[in-house]
A protein has these predicted regions:
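Stable alpha-helical elements in mature extracytoplasmic
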Residues: 4, 8, 115-119, 123, ...
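Structured segments of extracytoplasmic/periplasmic soluble domains
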Residues: 7-18, 123-126, 130, 169
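Intrinsically disordered, low-complexity boundary segments flanking structured domains
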Residues: 12-17, 60-66, 86-92, 144-153
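A broadly tuned preference for mixed-charge, low-complexity surface segments
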Residues: 25-43, 121-140, 172-182
Length: 197
């Protein structure tokens, strides 16, 4: 429901207020249910595979759009999966060019808060934010992907940088934040999405 997105809206508006004099407003609206799934992001994709997928995804988005959808600045396709049948989700992705994304989420009330983290992460990709974690290991990259890189001792961190994706517990372990309350948006991410000049 639209009310489930209010947490994400408020989080982003409060984060933006730390960087901008003028308020930034986010309005998230749940669209209609679609019958055709977006093209799957290829596993271990070559550059050519990624380009082909990107073109297919843009074509999919163009074909799915109807006049009742209005003219959103960003369109995220939310793919919900039953955690009883799917233990792990494939990687979500969003494209800055075209401002579209395919977001994989769990369809369970107990996963709502973690879904908000994934949704906010992918939404910021659509506005130009870059990942700040090692794609091979999933670990946040120091210092860019750390919420508090100056902390002494460095570990364990208490929060995740949103685009770092995980809370670093040691140099080789991390955990997913349980909710947006355990994330921050650092200066580099704020600059990438235009909140800092």
């Amino acid at each position: 429901s639209n009310s489930s997105f209010q947490t994400v809206q408020q989080y982003l508006q409060q984060a933006a207020a730390q960087y901008r004099q003028q308020p930034v407003y986010f309005y998230l609206q749940l669209g209609r249910e679609l019958k055709q799934l977006p093209p799957q992001v290829p596993e271990q994709a070559s550059l050519l595979d990624s380009i082909i997928w990107s073109l297919k995804f843009r074509f999919y988005a163009w074909r799915q759009h109807q006049s009742v959808d209005g003219a959103p600045h960003v369109t995220l396709y939310l793919n919900y999966y039953d955690p009883a049948h799917q233990k792990a989700l494939k990687h979500s992705t969003a494209l800055e060019k075209g401002r579209i994304g395919s977001v994989n989420l769990f369809a369970a009330e107990r996963q709502t808060q973690q879904n908000h983290v994934v949704l906010a992460h992918e939404l910021l990709h659509a506005f130009g934010a870059r990942d700040k974690y090692d794609l091979a290991t999933g670990l946040p990259i120091y210092p860019l992907g750390y919420a508090n890189p100056q902390q002494q001792p460095r570990y364990p961190q208490q929060k995740a940088e949103l685009m770092g994706g995980h809370i670093p517990l040691s140099s080789s372990t991390s955990k997913r934040p349980d909710s947006l309350q355990y994330t921050v948006i650092n200066d580099l991410t704020a600059a990438e999405i235009g909140w800092l000049r």
